[in-house]
Amino acid sequence: MSYERRKMPNKGEWAVEAQGLIKNFGDNRAVDGVNLNVRAGSIYGVLGPNGAGKTTTIRMLATLLRADAGSTRIFGHDVVKESQIVRQLIGVTGQYASVDESLSATENLVIFSRLLGLGRAEARKKAVELLEEFDLTEAAKRPLKNFSGGMRRRLDLAASLIAQPPLLFLDEPTTGLDPRTRNQMWETIRRLVTSGSTVLLTTQYLQEADELADRIAVIDHGRVVAEGTVNELKSSVGTSSLQLSIQDPKEIENARQKVEEVLKVRSIVYPEGGKITAPMEDADRVTDLLIAFRQSGIQLAELSVQKPTLDEVFLSITGDNKNESSLNFSKQ
């Protein structure tokens, strides 16, 4: 495939139109009728726990895996019938860096550029530009085996941008990164969209979806169980969010049971901070909860009422506590 800078599509045009995608692996249906519509010039988040079908969906959209049923169009081009055209319109960055750790950052980018058809001089120029963009200039000649995980991830993203694709698939690009590096990646993703790209991002980090995505699809067991803007999804579970901490950590499970009993909702516990959060339709029910705590001898350390969180959205939609172990509820 020869290198060519692609014209960015008009904002508002459909970048992705996927209908009824199905993929089976033996007796396991990994993706079960997924529909996704992503507008050009936006960041679209696909949120779900490990094993929900996010990566399989991305692979089908990116022509890396053929769907058993359903159809996908990328900027109007069918991914099966026009796969060669589609591949020139997209870039893909996965959870695991696709760079060669035996080479330097510069050597990796030059090789990728040459494979895309750039001449020697143009390939080196592109490598220098990308290393500067991703704050890797000082490490340009260093062997990748000495890179941190965050540096390798940034280099992988840089490699996917050599051809400046109109559509970029990012499959959990910040998994395993420290908070500082994750924030740097977020800023890079925002700049990409500002410059005209479209980003489809899969993640298991709730805060990441909240920070970046214009719209979010929640996937569970291979199906899209909810879709909308962040505010639309938050509004779907209630008007408020109860946040509270208990003085005695040993009482946290009793407190959780009282919250669910009084408010008639499911709650989430953050063990590391001893915090309980739950959606709440009627703020007046706080009084009933305080009475229940007093009668049970449970002492509060802190209580507040805020806007609903994506944590509560996911738990409310799936209604399945087992997802708490595989979906990252931590505040990155």
Question: Positions of the model-derived regions?
Answer:
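Residues at or immediately flanking beta-strands
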Residues: 71, 143, 241-243, 299-304
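Non-catalytic connector elements of ABC transporters
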Residues: 263-332
